C-alpha cells in the first residue's frame, strides 16, 4: 500500500508541473542553406550559454528551418553545424525573440576518410562531471574484451581479476549507454568479458551522480558508451585479431549501421575463441598446520555475442527505439592444485593433496531487451520511458577428485560431482520527466525493478558403483527483490554559480528462501527484508576564472549485496578450502563528499571523503575445530576512505601528447569478524597511470602506457604488495581513405602485473600470490566499410546529448 500511495502522489505532482513551468518563452528562428541556396535538412542547431555549455539542441527540418523556444534569460551564442560544411557561430546576444533569417554554410571538402576520423578526440578528455576514456582512440585497447579495456581507464583498478575499484574504493555502478545492467559480481564480469572493445566508444567515470540515477555505487559510476554511427547509408567495421600469451586466441567482431531518413538500424556479432590461463599459489598456517599449494587454472570457455536494434523518429518530437542483446559463454575448464600438508614449525611434509576440478560443462547465457520512447518539444520538456527485460542462465557441472598421498603412496580418495544452476529473471520500468522551471531545469521520475534469482545445487559423493547425494550440500535457494524508486532533481545557473540538488527514495522488498534436507525431512529458512532509504545529493560549482571552476558535491549511496554473495550454497575448491555465500548480508551505506577543481578542461584535482557503515567484504577465515578455510562475505563494521586525485592532459608538441592520472588514498578499516577478532587497520596507498601517444612518420601512431600500484589494503585485513605494468602499441592506417587499420600490441612487457597479498590474525596466516595471463602479444586488423552514397551524417546529437546527460 505504501508503494501505491507514493506512486499516486508523484503522478499527481507531474500533472501540476506545467502550471509552475510557464515562463516567458522567447523564439529563435532561421533557415539554413548551402552555397547553392538549397535548404540543409538535419543541420545541428545548438544554443550555448555564457559558459559555452549547450543548453538546447535541435535539428533543421526538410526545408532547412529551425525554431528554438527558450525561457531562461541570459547571454547566448547560436552554433550551427553539418557534416561536410564549416561551422557557423553567431555573435553573443541577449535572449529575446529573434530571427536569424537565411544562414549560409560554406562547404568543406569531405570524403570517407574525413567521415571516419573527423572530430578527433584526445585519448582522455576531461568534463566538469566526468573523466572520459575514449576507447576507440586507444591503440592497445583494441582486440580485447570490455573487461580488459576497462583496466586502461584512469582511476580504475581491477583487483585479482574479480573486483572493480575506482579511485581506490570498491562499489562501482556499471551502466551501458546510460542503462543499468542489474548484474554484479561474477555475473557482471562475465558480461563485460563477452563485450568486444571494438563495440565501445568510451568509458565515462562519474564521481558524483545526481539523484536521477540509482543510488548504487559508493565509489561512483562508470558508463560504457557503445558506438553508434551517424553516417547515412550502410556502413560498419570488421575487426579480426590474434592474441598470444600462454595459448593462442582468436578475436572476431563485425558491426553495421544503416541510416536512412527517420530510421536507423544497427547490429553486431562477436566471438572470442581460445583458452585463458591463471597461476596462483597460497601458503597457509592454521592452528599450527601448514598448507602450501600451487594451482594451474585453465579457462576453456568461448565467448559469443550479438546485438540488433533500431531507432525511429516518428516526427520531430517523438522517437521510439528497441534493441536485443545476446551474450554467451560456454565450454569447459580445469584446475589442478597440489597442496603440501605439514607442520607449521618445520619443513616436514606429512601429506600431499592432489585436487582436480574438471568443469566438464559450463554455460552462461544472457538475453536483454529494451524498448524506449522519447518525447522532446521546443519548450524544454522531455519524457523518457524505458521497459527492460532480461534473463541470465548460468550452469556448471564439475567432477572433483581429492587424492591424499603419504610418502608417494595413496592413502585416501574423495571423489565428488556437483551440478549448479542459476536462473535470474530481471524486469525494469523507468519513467523520466524534464521541464524548465523557475529559470532552471527540473527533473523527476519513477523506477520499478523486479529480480528473481533461482539457484539449484546438487552435490554427490562418487562411489564405485553409484553417486550418493550429500544432503548437507544439496539445496535450492530462491531470492526475490523488488525496488520502487522515485526522485526529484533541480539544477540552475546563477551567473558564475551553478547549483544542483536532488532527493531519491528507494524502497526495497526482498526475501531469500532456502530449502534443504535435514534428517530426511525438507526444511525451510526464510530471510525477508523491507526497508526504505532516502538518498540526498547536492552540488555547487563556481566558475572562478575564465578557464577554471571549483565544485563541491555530496551524496548518500547504497551497495546491495550481489546475488552470489547472498546464496548460502557451499562450493568446494578442494577438501581443505571452499566458498559460501551469506543470506544475512546487509547493504552497505556510504556518505560521500568531493571537492574538485577543473582548469581548462585539461586538469582535474579532486579530494574525496567516503564513510561506509555496514561495510562488507569477502574474507578468508579458518573454520573452528577444523583445518578448512572458508571464503565468504561478511558485514564487518566501518570503512573510511579519503583520496586525492590528479588528472592531467598535456600536448607536448604536435607529435607527442600524454595523459596522467594519479590517486593517493588512505583507507581505515574498523572491522570485526566476530566478538573476539577485531581489526583497526590503516593503510596509505597510491595508484598512477601514464599514457603517451606519439605520431610517427609513415602514418604510424605509437602508444606507450604504464600503471603502478603501491602496497595497499584490500578487503577487510588483506595487505597487497605493489605491482605494475607497461604496455606498448603500434598502429598504421592504410588502404583507400584510411579504411584499414593494423595494430601490434605487447601487454605487460616484463610481467609485472602479479598479485601478492598477506592476511593474518592469531592462529591464522595466509599468503596468496600469482598472476593471470596479462603478458600477451596482440595483432589485430580493422576495416571500415561504407556505401558510396555518403553525403554526411544525419545529426541525432539532440537525442545523443540527452542520453549523454543521463550519465552526468
For each of these PLM feature ranges, what is it?
Residues 509-514, 546-592, 607-626, 747-762:
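Surface-exposed extracellular loop regions of Gram-negative outer-membrane beta-barrel proteins
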Residues 33, 44-48, 81-85, 99-139, ...:
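Short, acidic, small-residue-rich periplasmic hinge/interaction motif at the N-terminus
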Residues 294, 426-430, 470-475, 586, ...:
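Outer membrane beta-barrel strand-and-loop segments of large Gram-negative receptors
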Residues 305-329, 356-515, 543, 547, ...:
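Face-selective signature of the C-terminal outer-membrane beta-barrel domain
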Residues 146, 180-207:
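Short acidic/polar hinge/loop motifs at secondary-structure boundaries
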Residues 358, 475-483, 529, 558-606, ...:
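Outer-membrane beta-barrel signature, preferentially recognizing the C-terminal barrel domain
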Residues 100-104, 146-149, 188-191, 217-239, ...:
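N-terminal periplasmic accessory domains that precede
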Residues 247-275, 279, 289-335, 365-367, ...:
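Transmembrane beta-barrel wall of Gram-negative outer-membrane proteins
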Amino acid at each position: 500500500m505504501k508503494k501505491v500511495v507514493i506512486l499516486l502522489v508523484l503522478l499527481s505532482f507531474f500533472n501540476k508541473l506545467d502550471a509552475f513551468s510557464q515562463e516567458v518563452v522567447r523564439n529563435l528562428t532561421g533557415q539554413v542553406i548551402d552555397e547553392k541556396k538549397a535548404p540543409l535538412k538535419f543541420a545541428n542547431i545548438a544554443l550555448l550559454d555564457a559558459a559555452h555549455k549547450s543548453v538546447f539542441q535541435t535539428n533543421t527540418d526538410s526545408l532547412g528551418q529551425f525554431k528554438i523556444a527558450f525561457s531562461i534569460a541570459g547571454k547566448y551564442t547560436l552554433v550551427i553545424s553539418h557534416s561536410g560544411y564549416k561551422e557557423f557561430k553567431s555573435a553573443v546576444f541577449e535572449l529575446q525573440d529573434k530571427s536569424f533569417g537565411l544562414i549560409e554554410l560554406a562547404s568543406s571538402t569531405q570524403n570517407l576518410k574525413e567521415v571516419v576520423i573527423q572530430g578527433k578526440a584526445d585519448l582522455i578528455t576531461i568534463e566538469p562531471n566526468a573523466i572520459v576514456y575514449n576507447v576507440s582512440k586507444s591503440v592497445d585497447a583494441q582486440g580485447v574484451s570490455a573487461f580488459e579495456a576497462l583496466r586502461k581507464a584512469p582511476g580504475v583498478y581491477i583487483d585479482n581479476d574479480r573486483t572493480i575499484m575506482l579511485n581506490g574504493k570498491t562499489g562501482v555502478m556499471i551502466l551501458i549507454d546510460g542503462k543499468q545492467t542489474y548484474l554484479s559480481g561474477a555475473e557482471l564480469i562475465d558480461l563485460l568479458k563477452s563485450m568486444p572493445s571494438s563495440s565501445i566508444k568510451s568509458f565515462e567515470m562519474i564521481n558524483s551522480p545526481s539523484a536521477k540515477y540509482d543510488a548504487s555505487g559508493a565509489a561512483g559510476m562508470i558508463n560504457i558508451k557503445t558506438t553508434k554511427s551517424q553516417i547515412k547509408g550502410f556502413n560498419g567495421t570488421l575487426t579480426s585479431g590474434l592474441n598470444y600469451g600462454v595459448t593462442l586466441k582468436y578475436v572476431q567482431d563485425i558491426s553495421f549501421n544503416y541510416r536512412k531518413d527517420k530510421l536507423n538500424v544497427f547490429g553486431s556479432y562477436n566471438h572470442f575463441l581460445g583458452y585463458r590461463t591463471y597461476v596462483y599459489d597460497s601458503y597457509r598456517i592454521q592452528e599450527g598446520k601448514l598448507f602450501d599449494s600451487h594451482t594451474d587454472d585453465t579457462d576453456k570457455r568461448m565467448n559469443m555475442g550479438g546485438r540488433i536494434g533500431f531507432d525511429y523518429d516518428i516526427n520531430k518530437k517523438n522517437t521510439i527505439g528497441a534493441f536485443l542483446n545476446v551474450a554467451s559463454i560456454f565450454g569447459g575448464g580445469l584446475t589442478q592444485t597440489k597442496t603440501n600438508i605439514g607442520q607449521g614449525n618445520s619443513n616436514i611434509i606429512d601429506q600431499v593433496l592432489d585436487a582436480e576440478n574438471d568443469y566438464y560443462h559450463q554455460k552462461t547465457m544472457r538475453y536483454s531487451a529494451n524498448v524506449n520512447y522519447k518525447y522532446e518539444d521546443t519548450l524544454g520538456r522531455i519524457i523518457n520511458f524505458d521497459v527492460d527485460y532480461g534473463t541470465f542462465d548460468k550452469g556448471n557441472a564439475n567432477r572433483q577428485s581429492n587424492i591424499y598421498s603419504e610418502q608417494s603412496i595413496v592413502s585416501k580418495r574423495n571423489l565428488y560431482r556437483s551440478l549448479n544452476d542459476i536462473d535470474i529473471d530481471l524486469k525494469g520500468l523507468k519513467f523520466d520527466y524534464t521541464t524548465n522551471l523557475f529559470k532552471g531545469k527540473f527533473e523527476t521520475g519513477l523506477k520499478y525493478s523486479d529480480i528473481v534469482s533461482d539457484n539449484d545445487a546438487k552435490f554427490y559423493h562418487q562411489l564405485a558403483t553409484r553417486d550418493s547425494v550429500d544432503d548437507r550440500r544439496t539445496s535450492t535457494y530462491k531470492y526475490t527483490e523488488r525496488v520502487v524508486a522515485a526522485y526529484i532533481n533541480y539544477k540552475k545557473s546563477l551567473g558564475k554559480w551553478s547549483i544542483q540538488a536532488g532527493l531519491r527514495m528507494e524502497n526495497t522488498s526482498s526475501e531469500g528462501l532456502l530449502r534443504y534436507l535435514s534428517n530426511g525431512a525438507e526444511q525451510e529458512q526464510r530471510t525477508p527484508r523491507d526497508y526504505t532509504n532516502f538518498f540526498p545529493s547536492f552540488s555547487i560549482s563556481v566558475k572562478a576564472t575564465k578557464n577554471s571552476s571549483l565544485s563541491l558535491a555530496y551524496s548518500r549511496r547504497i551497495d546491495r549485496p550481489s546475488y552470489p554473495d547472498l546464496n548460502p550454497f557451499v562450493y568446494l575448491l578442494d577438501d581443505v578450502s571452499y566458498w559460501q555465500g551469506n543470506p544475512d548480508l546487509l547493504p552497505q551505506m556510504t556518505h560521500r563528499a568531493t571537492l574538485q577543481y577543473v582548469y581548462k578542461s585539461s586538469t582535474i584535482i579532486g579530494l574525496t571523503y567516503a564513510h561506509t557503515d555496514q561495510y562488507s567484504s569477502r574474507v578468508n577465515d579458518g573454520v573452528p575445530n577444523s583445518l578448512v578455510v572458508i571464503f565468504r562475505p561478511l558485514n564487518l563494521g566501518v570503512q573510511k576512505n579519503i583520496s586525492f586525485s590528479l588528472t592531467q592532459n598535456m600536448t607536448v608538441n604536435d607529435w607527442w601528447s600524454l595523459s596522467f592520472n594519479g590517486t593517493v588514498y588512505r583507507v581505515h578499516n574498523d572491522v570485526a569478524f566476530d566478538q573476539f577478532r577485531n581489526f583497526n587497520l590503516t593503510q596509505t596507498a597510491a595508484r598512477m597511470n601514464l599514457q603517451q601517444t606519439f605520431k610517427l612518420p609513415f602514418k604510424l601512431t605509437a602508444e606507450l602506457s604504464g600503471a603502478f600500484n603501491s602496497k595497499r589494503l584490500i578487503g577487510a585485513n588483506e595487505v597487497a604488495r605493489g605491482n605494475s605494468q607497461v604496455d606498448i602499441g603500434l598502429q598504421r592506417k592504410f588502404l583507400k581513405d584510411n579504411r584499414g587499420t593494423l595494430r601490434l600490441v605487447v601487454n605487460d612487457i616484463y610481467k609485472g602485473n602479479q598479485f601478492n597479498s598477506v592476511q593474518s590474525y592469531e592462529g591464522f596466516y595466509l599468503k596468496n600470490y600469482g598472476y593471470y595471463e596479462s603478458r600477451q602479444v596482440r595483432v589485430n586488423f580493422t576495416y571500415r566499410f561504407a556505401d558510396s552514397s555518403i553525403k554526411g551524417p544525419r545529426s541525432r546529437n539532440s537525442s545523443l546529448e540527452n542520453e549523454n546527460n543521463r550519465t552526468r
